[in-house]
């Protein structure tokens, strides 16, 4: 599996934490880290997602996590279905718009954001953006001529 860097949210003075991979493969669960081959663990993360135009969406989601690489792996299909369910109730006109998972937020800030006591600007100030966003290409097993 090869690693490719993708576009990254430029957060200025924001705290940078974790690396992130949005897994587009339905049939690949990444039970092992695609970089270091260590077994991944399941952990809940509070993801901050920017939805065009200028909308923040907070998602409490179980993701695969490699502690060695500090890599969070989230399945794209699961993220999109959870976003669709949430946005259909709060803001249905932006469903299907482009989005970018930009970072994580602490649980106390997530609760305050969902309760409506934090503005989007305050959430951005308190969140941790990803250090890097990775892409991995899955190469199916088999014989390949050299």
Predicted region positions:
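Short metal-binding segments enriched for Cys and/or His
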Residues: 59-85
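A boundary/linker detector
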Residues: 1-9
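Short cysteine-rich clusters marking metal-coordination/redox-active sites
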Residues: 33-37, 66-69
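Long, contiguous alpha-helical scaffold regions
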Residues: 86-146
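Short Cys/His-rich Zn2+-coordinating modules
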Residues: 8-22, 44-55
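Short cysteine/histidine-rich metal-coordination sites, predominantly Zn2+-binding motifs
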Residues: 47-57, 81-92
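Short, non-ligating residues that shape and space the ligands of small metal-coordination modules
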Residues: 39-43, 75-76
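Short metal-coordination and nucleic-acid-contact micro-motifs, chiefly zinc-binding Cys/His arrays
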Residues: 25-30, 45, 59-65
């Amino acid at each position: 599996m090869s690693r490719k860097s993708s576009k990254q949210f430029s957060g200025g003075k924001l705290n940078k934490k974790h690396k992130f991979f949005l897994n587009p493969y339905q049939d690949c669960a990444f039970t092992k880290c695609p970089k270091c081959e260590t077994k991944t663990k399941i952990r809940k993360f509070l993801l901050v997602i920017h939805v065009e135009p200028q909308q923040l969406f907070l998602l409490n989601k179980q993701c695969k996590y490699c502690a060695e690489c500090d890599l969070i792996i989230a399945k794209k299909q699961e993220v999109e279905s959870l976003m669709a369910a949430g946005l259909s109730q709060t803001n249905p006109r932006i469903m299907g718009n482009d989005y970018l998972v930009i970072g994580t937020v602490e649980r106390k800030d997530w609760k305050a954001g969902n309760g409506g006591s934090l503005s989007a600007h305050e959430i951005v100030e308190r969140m941790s953006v990803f250090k890097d966003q990775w892409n991995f290409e899955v190469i199916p097993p088999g014989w390949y001529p050299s």
